[in-house]
Structure formats: structure tokens, C-alpha cells
Amino acid sequence: LIRYNRLSTIPSSLANCSKLDEFNIEGNNVSQLPEGLLSSLVHLNTISLARNNFNSFPLGGPTQFTSVHSINMECNTIDKIPFSIFSLAKYLSKLNMRENALTSLPLDIGSWTALVELNLATNQLTIIPEDIKSLQNLEVLIMSNNQLKRIPPSLGQLRKLRHLDLEENKLDSLPQEIGYLRELTRLIVASNQLTQLPRSIGSLSNLTHLNVGENNLSSLPEDIGQLEKLEQLYINDNPNLDVLPYELALCTNLQIMSIENCPLRSLPQEIVAGGPSLVIQFLKVQGPFNLN
């Protein structure tokens, strides 16, 4: 095992290990690989260069990733994914570039069509390219802790998406098209600048986890009551959230609701002080739905 060994160089003789299917040098001090090393390991399935000192992709071009299914380069200082670097990576289903220094994504991102999981958290990305719509197999998209200001409507075309994490960005709105993500089970948009949620959020019929805490919401759409599978709702730390829709009581599977640091002035304060379960009970009793 080469992992966590304080190595700063990798011997080029490793190219002779032609049957190697996993190349894992996680947790060392490596900043570059011998040129073409990965290309010579033609049976590679998994590559992890995580937690090293790489500031660019290994030298060797697209042939390095021809047979690879999973690439993990998290926790380096890579500032660029080279154009066409994955042009031969027709099996690449998992790419983790978390905690790097990316400021943009390559123009050919739409060609990464085998991707199922894409983790770009904790970079300096400002834009999600429209072409992301071409990643029709994508199930997990994590772009938390970036500098995103808007979500392209084309994101709504990722019909297999199950997990979308956009926490800690600079979003002030979500597109109506987000309602097309019918397979979505987890939507995390906490710590943004959202002032409202689109009504189409009620179309996310498989959603179990919704986190919209730490935003600037003043209300929630009545359509939230259509989320029959919702189990966890985080609306904490929205300093302008005065009112909750009676429809929230229709979310009968709700188990966890976080409402800390929301004024909820339209509700009796003794109800709010009693916590989430009392709030839901109040909405049931006072609302027009006769849920008792």
C-alpha cells in the first residue's frame, strides 16, 4: 500500500505492474506522476490521487483514463480540468474534485455522459455550464461551498438526479425547472441568499430531505404540502420567516423540522416555543384540512 506514506515521488517502474486495477496514492506529498504512467496501466479501474500536492492533472493526456470508472482527486490545489482530458473516459461514472482550486469547468463537460456522481464542492466555481443537461446519468451533484450565483434552468433536465447539494453559495433564487427533478430525494440549498422557493418544488414527489436553512426566506410556498414523502425539513435561521403555510401539515411523514431562529410571528409564541411538533399540530388544527 502506498497510501499515507509521505512519499513525494512515485517510481516510473510502477508502469510494469500492467495488471494493476487500482492506483491509490492518497495522503502523500506527490505533486506529479511520471509522464504516461497511468496510460501504461491499461487495466486501471480506480484512481485516487486525493490529499497530495497536485496543482494540475497528471501528464499523459486522455489515454490515462480510458478504462477508469472512478477518479478521486480531492484535497489538492488543481485549478483546471483540461479540455478533452476525459474524451476517452467512456466508463467514468464517479469524479471527485472536492477541495481544489477550480474556477471554471471545461467547455466539453457535456461529453462526460457516463457520470453518475460528480463532486465539485469547495472550489471557486461561479457558473454551472448549461451543458450540464447532457449528463443524463447523473444521480449525485455536489457543488456546495462555491461562488455560484444562479442555477441554469437546464439543470431540470437531469431526470435521474437523486441528490443535489448547493449549500453555501450565493444563490438568490432557484429556477422553476427544478420541479422536473422527480427522482430527487435530497435537496440542500442552505446558506445562500434565497428570498423565496419556486412553487414547482411541490412537484418533487420523492423528496425526503429539504434543507433551506440560513437564507432570507419570508414564506414557504403552499405547494410544499404536496411533498408526501418529506421526512426532514430544515428552515432554521431565516430571519424574515414570519409565516408557515397550513399545507405543511399535509407532510404526514415529517419526522424532523428545524425552526430555530425563525420569528414565525404569525403563530402564537407559546406554540413556537413548544417546538416543531406543536407547530405542526397547530397547523393541523387551525388549517382548513380537517386533519385531526
Which stretches of residues belong to each language-model region?
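Conserved hydrophobic beta-strand positions in leucine-rich repeat
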Residues: 1-2, 23-25, 44-49, 68-73, ...
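Consensus "Asn ladder" position of solenoid repeat domains
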Residues: 5, 28, 49-52, 73-76, ...
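The feature encodes a structural signal of leucine-rich repeats
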Residues: 10-12, 33-36, 57-60, 81-84, ...
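Leucine-rich repeat
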Residues: 15-20, 39-44, 63-68, 87-92, ...
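Structured C-terminal portions of repeat-based eukaryotic scaffold domains
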Residues: 168, 180, 186, 191, ...
